[in-house]
Amino acid sequence: MGGLWSPLVRTEYLIILRHCLKTTKPLGESMVGSIVLFGPPGAGKGTQAGRIVELTSKPQVSTGDMLRAAVKSGSPMGLAAKEYMDAGLLVPDDVIIGLIQERLQEDDAGQGVLFDGFPRTIPQAESLEQIATVSSVISIEVPDDAIVDRIVGRRMDPETGEIFHVQFKPAPPEIEDRLIQRPDDTEETVRSRLEAYHNQTAPLADWYSDRGLLIRIDGNASINQVGVSVERAISRIL
C-alpha cells in the first residue's frame, strides 16, 4: 500500500482505520440482516436494488457512491482513495473496507444495509465477513447472450441523453438518424466485462451457497417478473 501514499495521508489513514476497528459495533448488533446483491452487467441490478430498499427500508451501500462522497469530503480515507483514482489504479480492498466500516457506523445502518457492487471477489467477501453480518445474498442471473442483446441494442439520443433500445424501446422515427451507440455498449466491450465478471465475481455464488445464504433469481424475464421474484425472496428473508 505504501508506494502511492504521502506520509501524512498514510498516517492519517492508519489512525482512522484503528478508530473504526475500535468503534465498530459488535457483529449481530450493528449489522442485523444485511443483504448482498450481485449479478452481471446489464442484469437489472439497479432497478431491483431500488425495489429491495423500498421493501426492507435498508439503506443502499454502493462503493462507487462511497468513494465519490469520501473524495468530495476530503477526509483522510477519501484522500487515500483519491491518490489511487487519480493514478488510474483500482482502490485497494483495505481502503474500501475502511470506507465501509465508516459507513456502517451511521445510524441508518443499525438494522443492516443492502450492499450493491460489493463484494466483487471472494477475498472481498472474506473481508466483509469480518466486519458485517450478511444474512442473505441475492444473485440475479442472466445468460451472456441475453446480456449482450440488452446492452448492445442500446442507443442514446445525444441531444437529450435519453436511452432507447432497437428491440425493447424503439426511438420515434423522427430522431432515429441522430441516435448513437456509446463506446461501453459495443459487443467487444460487453463480452470483455462479462469475462471479468465470470472470472472475479461469479465464484461468489458458490461461496455464499456453501454458507446457505444464496438466493438465485432468474433475471432473464421482464422487469415486473423479476421484481415479483425479488419480492418473494425478500418475504422469505424478513
Predicted regions and their residues:
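Glycine-rich phosphate-binding loop of ATP-dependent small-molecule kinases
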Residues: 2-238
